[in-house]
């Protein structure tokens, strides 16, 4: 097969591992920077171009689109879809998962365990918003944040009011969530592929830090999932419409709660912690599911 990997970073671990796994299986692989693509959209024959040349036909596309280029990257991916190329994760699923608030609303509708989450627009609503999530300590998150950036733990009510007011004053979109103290600064990353969790790791925050992201100095280790954790991770990925997802959950006193569903999960941490060939499993999944049938994206949710 001819496979396109949409990525701005050909030297990134995840991209290199996917290229390596695909080539080992005899596939032709092209790493394409979505920001270098431009599109011809017409009723006869749509196409994608780079540097004055039309891209050749592809059998499958694996999107590794960074959060900062979600809009343009999704548009390029959608163009591949309109041209009948199989997308490992489609543009609708990616856009849905990148909107943190929308993700929470969709999972709530499906009865998936979540931290109590509040969202408001006016400073006058702040006191009620804080009460809604159980008071301080609480977590304040920028909706556009990634890798733990834009996430604040407010340990007192006064601190919470000040931080929320400041974000509102900057016209930043935030959500407020209950703080799951019993998680002790640890979360679990479940790597979902299709209808299975193929790997999982526990991420522990550094001492004095509550964010467990590996980019923030957290450490990763093997973890044994409960059947409930496995089930809720798969349901969360399905709710987003994703074939591949990194589902982050916390162990709370009332069961697993989903923090985030990542449509472009990194491979380095999960492969390092579990020694599993996750990249190879992804390519095997693409081989089984790529079909040369024109696919039209249908937005749902």
Curated annotation (Swiss-Prot):
Gene Ontology BP annotations? protein modification process; SOS response; translation
What residues bind Mg(2+) 2, as annotated?
260, 262
**What cofactor does its activity depend on?**
Mg(2+); Mn(2+)
Binding locations of Mg(2+) 1: 248, 260
List the PROSITE patterns hit by this protein, alphabetically. ATP_GRASP
Q: Which domain of life is it from?
A: Bacteria
**Binding positions (Mn(2+) 1):** 248, 260
Describe the family membership recorded for this protein in Swiss-Prot or TrEMBL: Belongs to the RimK family.
This protein's name: Probable alpha-L-glutamate ligase 2
Q: Which organism is it from?
A: Shewanella baltica (strain OS155 / ATCC BAA-1091)
Its gene name is: rimK2
């Amino acid at each position: 097969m001819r496979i396109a990997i949409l990525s701005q970073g050909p030297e990134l671990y995840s991209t290199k591992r996917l290229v390596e796994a695909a080539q080992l299986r005899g596939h032709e692989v092209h790493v394409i920077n979505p920001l270098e693509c431009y599109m011809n959209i017409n009723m006869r024959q749509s196409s994608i171009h780079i540097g004055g040349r039309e891209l050749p036909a592809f059998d499958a596309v694996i999107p590794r689109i960074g959060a900062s280029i979600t809009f343009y990257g999704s548009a390029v991916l959608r163009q591949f879809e309109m041209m009948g190329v199989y997308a490992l994760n489609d543009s609708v699923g990616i856009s849905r998962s990148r909107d943190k608030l929308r993700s929470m609303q969709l999972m709530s509708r499906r009865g998936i365990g979540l931290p109590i989450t509040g969202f408001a627009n006016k400073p006058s609503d702040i006191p009620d918003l804080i009460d809604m999530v159980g008071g301080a300590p609480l977590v304040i998150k920028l909706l556009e944040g990634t890798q733990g950036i834009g996430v604040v733990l407010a340990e007192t009510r006064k601190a919470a009011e000040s931080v929320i007011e400041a974000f509102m004053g900057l016209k930043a979109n935030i959500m407020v969530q209950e703080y799951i103290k019993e998680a002790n600064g640890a979360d679990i990353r479940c790597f979902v592929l299709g209808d299975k969790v193929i790997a999982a790791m526990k991420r522990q925050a550094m001492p004095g830090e509550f964010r467990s992201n590996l980019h923030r100095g957290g450490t990763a280790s093997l973890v044994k999932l409960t059947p409930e954790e496995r089930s809720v991770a798969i349901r969360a990925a399905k709710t987003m419409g994703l074939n591949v997802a990194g589902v982050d959950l916390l162990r709370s006193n009332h069961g697993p709660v989903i923090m985030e569903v990542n449509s472009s999960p990194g491979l380095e941490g999960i492969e390092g912690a579990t020694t599993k060939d996750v990249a190879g499993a992804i390519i095997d999944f693409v081989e089984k599911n790529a079909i040369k049938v024109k696919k039209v994206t249908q937005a749902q949710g």
